[in-house]
Amino acid sequence: MDIFRKAVSSPDQAGAEAAGLRWLAQADERVVAEVVGVTGTSISTKRVRESRPSVAAARAFGEALCRVHQAGATAFGAPPEGWEGANFIGRVEQPCEPCERWGEFYAEQRIKPFLGGLPEEVSDSAFAAADAIAAVDWDVAPARIHGDLWAGNVLFQEDTAVMIDPAAHGGHPWTDLAMLELFGVPFYDEILRGYGVGQEYHQWVPMHQLHPLSVHALTHGSAYYAPLERAARATLEALR
């Protein structure tokens, strides 16, 4: 077996990621990297044999991602089975505390924790958007989501794609789709077609991008300030 070994910054990062991969794989092991070993400093997975992205593979991945989401979670913010406590988006720790309401979870655990280190003129609109999101009673069930699904964490194969490096938790399914759009992924429209997402999804893309934009504004700086503000304003407009 050809093994890929990834160094991590802490035992908790390794444990959370491994638990996330195994949890996602329970729903469809064909589209999740297989964990073969975990230490305090690394996580090892079966190496993914990559191929050129294609329409057919993107559509098949969209179908599989929908199945993974539909496997569900016990609550919003619930960590993967076999793990307790925070997980990591990249190397940044984020809370995973089970919550009954998606809006409250998303605002308090996925947006606000990353805004404190930003200039007030940037964070004010994002805080306002978070409060507005939390005030809504969203009609959605907890989905089993990857949580950090940018293009670099989607490795295409001949007939589908494989997910790596998750920040898996119970969340809103559109959060994964919106992150794919934010950072660009080959054949995005075909992924949506395979997934079967409705037109109403597009109105809420900026809201679901507030989490990754908040994280990147904190970790990567001013290049993400304007995109974060635009997403916050679009969210507030959609919620009026």
Model-derived segments and spans:
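ATP/Mg2+ or Mg2+-diphosphate-binding catalytic cores
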Residues: S10, H216-R240
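Active-site Asp-x-Gly
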Residues: P95-A107, V140-R144, A151, L155-P206, ...
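An alpha-helical support segment within catalytic cores of ATP-dependent transferases
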Residues: A73-R144
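Alpha-helical elements of Rossmann-like donor-binding domains used by nucleotide-donor carbohydrate transfer enzymes
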Residues: A19-W23, A60-R67, A128, E190, ...
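ATP-binding pocket architecture of kinase catalytic cores
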Residues: M1-E104
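Short strand-connecting beta-turns/loops that link adjacent beta-strands
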Residues: E29, G40, E158-T160, L210
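Short helix/strand-capping connector loops at secondary-structure junctions
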Residues: V205-H216
